[in-house]
């Protein structure tokens, strides 16, 4: 009996020790403009981190930057407080990651949407143009006016990459289609300006577009309001946004930031972290389009079938999607 009790105590202590070790793994998440409630890019990152907290037992703290000057001090604060992994969400954090990672070489860092070459930094990159191509094809197959729209957030190469892929996919289906494109601004505020998103979308709808794809962070929510007013279709981005305006969000271009964030946390915690670039595309479902109970009645089966055929052709290399980064 005593031997059994000693064994039970040993197992219990071992369990507590293991739980403590896991709980001691600390992750600091620095979100971009718009914050975790943007229902898009940041929301996806936050979802991946909270899933890691739930499943892996990590300690998680997130902060929302109010302007670009805040990124570096926020990251440095995490590093100084002995966080094991610090994740920056968005290309605007590239310079901050470069500086802080160099100052704390024993810490692990990750960044979404920017390439930082350092042994302790993982760059999480996505083939947005591939996903946008499929979305463009879906928009063109659904349009009855021969005009579709694109509302981008900040006018930067990343969003131009979305736009280029979107237009190429639309023209694959209808070479004569007109693609209207506008951007919400040239500063970080462009990601969190729903009134501007709505203004641009209304103008595009009133110019004849009947489907609009948004790649604008929280500003895209304004475009969804415009879709509701005009009773036209909009397309979401990054997270599955079909639920936000049921019957009006035709689909969403999924960019699995949540998956990338979860994976890098898991690898860092388990001692398998390596620096370098990890890319996510159609082949590994890093980008895709959404189908669920909110859009299955408006996203026609014939459209889905053709979209899936195009996905297969891209993965097989039969279609090479134009890439703004390589133009």
Predicted regions and their residues:
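Positively charged n-region of N-terminal signal peptides that target proteins for export
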Residues: 1-6
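Bacterial N-terminal signal peptides
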Residues: 8-19
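A residue-level marker of the well-folded mature domains of exported/periplasmic proteins
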Residues: 23-327
């Amino acid at each position: 009996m005593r031997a059994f009790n000693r064994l039970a105590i040993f197992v219990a202590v071992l369990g507590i020790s293991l739980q403590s070790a896991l709980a001691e793994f600390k992750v600091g998440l620095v979100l971009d403009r718009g914050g975790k409630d943007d229902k898009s890019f940041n929301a996806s990152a936050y979802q991946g981190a909270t899933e890691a907290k739930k499943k892996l037992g990590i300690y998680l703290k997130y902060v929302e930057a109010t302007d670009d000057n805040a990124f570096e001090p926020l990251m440095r604060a995490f590093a100084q407080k002995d966080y094991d992994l610090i994740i920056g969400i968005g290309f605007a954090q590239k310079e901050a990651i470069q500086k802080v990672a160099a100052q704390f070489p024993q810490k692990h860092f990750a960044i979404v949407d920017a390439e930082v070459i350092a042994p302790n930094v993982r760059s999480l990159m996505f083939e947005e143009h591939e996903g946008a191509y499929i979305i463009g094809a879906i928009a063109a197959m659904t349009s009855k006016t021969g005009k579709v729209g694109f509302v981008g957030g900040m006018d930067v190469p990343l969003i131009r990459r979305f736009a280029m892929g979107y237009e190429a996919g639309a023209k694959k289906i209808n070479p004569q289609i007109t693609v209207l494109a506008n951007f919400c601004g040239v500063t970080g505020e462009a990601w969190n300006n729903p009134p501007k998103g709505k203004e641009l979308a209304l103008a595009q709808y009133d110019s004849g577009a009947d489907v609009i794809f948004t790649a604008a962070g929280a500003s895209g929510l304004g475009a969804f309001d415009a879709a509701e007013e005009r009773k036209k279709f909009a397309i979401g981005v990054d997270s599955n946004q079909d639920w936000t305006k049921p019957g009006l969000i035709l689909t969403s271009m999924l960019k699995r930031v949540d998956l990338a964030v979860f994976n890098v946390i898991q690898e860092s915690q388990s001692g398998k972290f390596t620096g370098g670039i990890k890319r996510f595309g159609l082949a590994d479902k890093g980008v895709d389009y959404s189908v669920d109970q909110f859009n299955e009645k408006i996203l026609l089966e014939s459209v889905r079938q053709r979209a899936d055929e195009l996905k297969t052709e891209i993965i097989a290399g039969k279609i090479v999607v134009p890439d703004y980064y390589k133009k």
